[in-house]
A protein has these predicted regions:
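Cysteine-centered motifs
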Residues: 19, 28-29
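Ala/Thr-enriched low-complexity intrinsically disordered regions
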Residues: 6, 18-20, 52-53
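Patatin-like phospholipase
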Residues: 48-97, 105-493
Length: 493
């Protein structure tokens, strides 16, 4: 950049201010040790800065909340809103598709307690008009029954009626409050049939009595659900055309957005975002359950997940799969483990220099891993293998204790009851893992034998052959050895 070229300096300041907005700062500040020349001061003052050696500019935010489609996953979005509200982060614009349209209306209304209670109690029959069936305690049996009922009803009636959802919307939304909210604009997305054309609706500009229609149109996942008729036109789920409506927020003047993706079906719309548009993605690595079957227990888990993921995004907590107050102790344990491998067992760790090792670890961890974060990655992967749920804030020591006390040979009896209803994909993975349990038992016994017999050569072979899997087993062994109760046990392994 050349001094005096206004356009270049304007862009420079825009990018610097975008960086400050990314960290949600109130001001953008330049601090100089010595007074600036008149020419330099002119450049700063021309671009809105005040002062002489400390030049400040108050940042202006036009923040949007973008709520993607995702059906029964929607509780996650309310959890995100809880965290944002705690930090007094407000929005000028909300854009929502499908369940995002419904949640957008609840958020626009501003009644957190009502939104949370609604999702905590929500079941499939409060959304879809399915035939009554006898109460079933077994989650898997209930899943198959509800899915069969939904498929049969959709085929016979051309889509399951959403009359219960319509009643719930009308009972829980104050239409006058939505219509006359002076601070926040709500835009919903639906798909016009049969053209499959994207329709964006400014909720405050539509007729009051039509507000429920446009919210329901956005969430009508045709043909599984019946389409919505407004006037002479038919409308279906907005996710068919624009699953995550970031572009609408940009077009309506947003300069930054919190984007909440709840794993709705189908690809997201491809858009080109302005260089200085800031967006914070809030999505989870965990699956969120069935897309069309609503379950109160799963909703509560997803509420907690959304809250914790957003708190991590805001820098309050740490972790990738799980949430921690601090991750520093994980590094301490990992350094001790590496020392144990090299000094006590006398293993050689050349695989750490292999690109393939880091690629596999990153693929498993679903995030970047470097030597400094390897200990945390391994700890979280162990927690997953031992069925620890991600809906609480952990201390590293507490997590290690829970891992060491949990038997990997079997799933906890109450695990499904704590999670709630699973999706088809999750049920398949659950069944597959049950079949793998015997293999896990065999591995554990085998490595216990190698460690007890100090079979260094065989351990080295396994470590070079399958470094990630072997490290996880050895790390668990080491963590157990480090537990106070284990050190004091007279028959410790």
């Amino acid at each position: 950049m050349i001094e005096g070229e206004t356009f270049e300096w304007k862009n420079f300041f825009r990018y610097m201010e975008a960086c400050a907005r990314f960290f949600i700062k109130e001001n953008c500040c330049f601090l100089f040790q010595f007074p600036l020349s008149e020419e330099w001061l002119r450049i700063f003052h021309k671009n809105g800065y005040q002062g002489t050696t400390q030049l400040n500019k108050k940042l202006v935010y036009h923040t949007a909340l973008v709520l993607g489609g995702g059906g029964a996953h929607g509780a996650y979005q309310i959890g995100v809103w809880q965290a944002l509200k705690e930090h007094d982060i407000n929005f000028e614009i909300i854009t929502g598709t499908s369940v995002g349209a419904l949640n957008g209306a609840l958020i626009l209304q501003g009644d957190m307690k009502k939104a949370v209670n609604l999702w905590k109690k929500l079941s499939t029959r409060q959304v879809l008009a399915l035939p009554e069936m006898a109460a079933v305690e077994d989650l898997r049996e209930r899943f198959y029954r509800e899915r069969r009922q939904m498929t049969k009803t959709a085929l016979i009636e051309g889509g399951v009626s959403s009359a219960p959802l319509e009643k719930m919307v009308k009972d829980n939304l104050d239409l006058s409050l939505l219509k006359h909210n002076p601070k926040i604009r709500l835009y919903t997305v639906s798909t016009k049939l049969p053209e499959l054309a994207e329709v964006v609706t400014d909720i405050q500009q539509t007729k009051t009595e039509e507000i429920p229609d446009w919210i329901l149109a956005s969430a009508s996942f045709y043909p599984a659900m019946a389409y919505r008729k407004i006037g002479k036109n038919k409308y279906a789920d907005g996710g068919y055309r624009n699953k995550i409506p970031i572009d609408i927020a940009i077009n309506k003047g947003a300069t930054e957005a919190f984007v909440v993706d709840v794993q709705g079906p189908g690809p997201a719309k491809k858009i080109r975002m302005p260089d200085i548009f800031i967006h914070w993605k809030c999505q989870t690595l965990w699956t969120l359950g069935s897309f069309l079957l609503f379950d109160s227990q799963r909703n509560q888990l997803n509420l907690q997940l959304g809250y914790l993921e957003m708190k991590k995004r805001l820098g309050c907590y740490y972790g990738n799969w799980y949430t921690f107050h601090s991750v520093k102790p994980a590094r301490t344990y990992w350094r001790g483990f590496l020392s144990y491998l090299t000094k006590e067992i006398q293993l050689e760790l050349s695989f750490f220099k292999s690109i393939k090792f880091w690629q596999k670890l990153r693929n498993l961890y679903k995030n970047r891993v470097v030597p400094e974060t390897c200990g945390l990655a391994m700890l979280e992967l162990l927690a997953k293998k031992h069925f620890l749920l991600p809906n609480e804030i952990y201390q590293v020591d507490m997590m290690i204790q829970m891992i060491c006390q949990q038997d990997i040979k079997s799933m906890p009896d109450d695990l499904l009851a704590q999670i709630g209803q699973l999706s088809t994909e999750e049920w398949l993975r659950y069944r597959k893992y049950q079949q793998k349990i015997q293999n896990e038992r065999t591995k554990t016994v085998y490595f216990d034998f190698l460690l007890q017999g100090k079979r260094k050569d065989r351990l080295q072979y396994e470590l070079l052959k399958q470094p990630v899997d072997t490290l996880l087993i050895l790390y668990l062994y080491y963590l157990k050895e480090e537990q106070p109760w284990h050190k004091n046990f007279h028959m410790k392994s």
